[in-house]
Amino acid sequence: MAGSLSEIKAKIISTEKTSKITSAMRMVSSAKLVRSEQAARDFQIYASKIRQITTDLLKSELTIGSDNPMLVSRPVKKTGYIVITSDKGLVGGYNSKILKSVMDMITEYHADGDYEIISIGSVGSDFFKARGMNVAFELRGLADQPSFEQVRQIISQSVDMFVNEIFDELYVCYNHHVNSLTSQVRVQQMLPISDLVADEAAEEGVTGFELEPNRHDILDQLLPQFTESLIYGAIIDAKTAEHAAGMTAMQTATDNAKNVINDLTIQYNRARQAAITQEITEIVAGANALE
């Protein structure tokens, strides 16, 4: 019985240590989440402005027609997917949701292998490579608060692959942050640009100004920046969802550890009570034997 008591006590101590670790990790993820949510809000200011300017410029461009490859739909022979996952685990179902969604799409629409994957995150890269899938580029070791400079190259490569007709449409697949408990899988078309309509532009915008050198040349410079900003925004959004998933997973782990500790404590008390009862019984039996 003493051995049993010591074993239970050791389990309680071990679980308490685990609970402290998961609680600390939850607080770290919570702090990262707050910073990511602020970064996402700050980015939306820039994203809204560049969208307004781009849409305003396209008001007349759509009227006269544009041959910019980023605006022109062409027959789809191959599709590109930017897939955003985490670099580490301990984030609950964050990675499994997006990877399942991507696999379902590829199974349904790309049985002939007419796709390219641009993978951001080690979990996704390892997953796709282990299955022999078409991974064109990958980015590992993304910072908790990624800067545009860190992702500029892989984003630019993705846009260039579309412009150079390596694939004919580009989607970004990621977990959209809703709140600390919820995220939603998003598969968002980035290229060709098709969701900018003239009535989205502000009533007073750059259409009232003379532009140098001309609208066409400005759009050639602006459209890649606009698309790259959308992809970067998706990365920030995905990182925010990742931190929320990590916080939730660690909170769940902490709660489970506390439940285990409670169960072990009850088990320990019962075992201790049984041991004491047995000792008393033995003492009484010994005393009776002496009479």
From Swiss-Prot:
The keyword Transport applies. The keyword Protease does not apply. It holds the Pfam family ATP-synt. SUPFAM superfamilies: ATP synthase (F1-ATPase), gamma subunit. GO terms for biological process: proton motive force-driven plasma membrane ATP synthesis. Keywords: ATP synthesis, Cell membrane, CF(1), Hydrogen ion transport, Ion transport, Membrane, Transport. It is a peripheral membrane protein. GO terms for cellular component: plasma membrane; proton-transporting ATP synthase complex. It is found in: Cell membrane. GO terms for molecular function: ATP binding; proton-transporting ATP synthase activity, rotational mechanism. InterPro entries: ATP_synth_F1_ATPase_gsu, ATP_synth_F1_gsu, ATP_synth_F1_gsu_CS. Its main location: membrane. Signal peptide: none annotated. Produces ATP from ADP in the presence of a proton gradient across the membrane. The gamma chain is believed to be important in regulating ATPase activity and the flow of protons through the CF(0) complex. Belongs to the ATPase gamma chain family. PANTHER family: ATP SYNTHASE GAMMA CHAIN, ATP SYNTHASE SUBUNIT GAMMA, MITOCHONDRIAL. F-type ATPases have 2 components, CF(1) - the catalytic core - and CF(0) - the membrane proton channel. CF(1) has five subunits: alpha(3), beta(3), gamma(1), delta(1), epsilon(1). CF(0) has three main subunits: a, b and c. This is ATP synthase gamma chain. The lineage of its organism: Bacteria, Bacillati, Bacillota, Bacilli, Lactobacillales.
